[in-house]
Amino acid sequence: KEYTDDAIVSIAENLDFLPASQSARWEDIGRKKYKKLVRRLCDVYDYILIDAPAGIGKGIESILDLVSRCIVVTHPLWVSLRNGARMIQVCQEHNIRDFAIAFNAVPVDGEDIDLYDMLEVLRAEYVGAMIPYDEDILTYTQDGHLLDLASHEFRNVLAPLVDYVVTGDCWEDYDVQKQFDAYVTKKKTDKEEACTPTLASAGESIFGDSNTVLYINRGGWTTQRLLVQGKQSLWRRRKLK
């Protein structure tokens, strides 16, 4: 108990985190000790989310003996969907009928992802969330930083999943799709605005004419800078000769 209390990290108000051991494996801990640990945590917390190891093994079986509902995380890839379908089958074999699907890293550019096609492959009915692929999330993960959902668009995307965790009720699938589409639309709009060049503005040129028009966009690109770089490159080539 003392070791567990020391290992628990407070993340935010009403949210604690117990990191996995970096040395002990599931096989080393054993089912009995693991169940004892989770039951001890149940006496302290209202909700416990367990990040299960990938695949289907003894670790999953130990978890399924304890949980009241499952979130099956999968990707919009054929292999991942097949694995997700197998995970659902394992849940049913353990008499767990309360589960929701969380589609992770769903592409937002150039690919048409059909929610109902994925559900058909999984033979599932309830959707917990459609989580879009976002490079910012990868950066946060690599750097070990937490994402502030209060000021991020992911807050709305994850709202259906949070409701499922708290209440056990799933949103209608079209409402989940609507949240995802709204996120994608906003991202595309922000991207288009960032790439749109500004109008021409007066500025000094490399030719010394103060009235020469200097084209600048929001990314910092300028015709002046390119011309200067071109002249410098030409000068270097001539000097080398």
How would you describe each model-predicted region?
Residues 1-43, 140-143, 147-148:
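P-loop/Walker-type NTP enzyme "switch/lid" segment
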Residues 59-77:
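Inter-motif core of Ras-like GTPase G domains
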Residues 143-241:
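NTP-binding/hydrolysis catalytic cores, primarily Walker-type P-loop NTPases
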Residues 42-59:
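Glycine-rich phosphate-binding loop used to anchor ATP phosphates in small-molecule kinases
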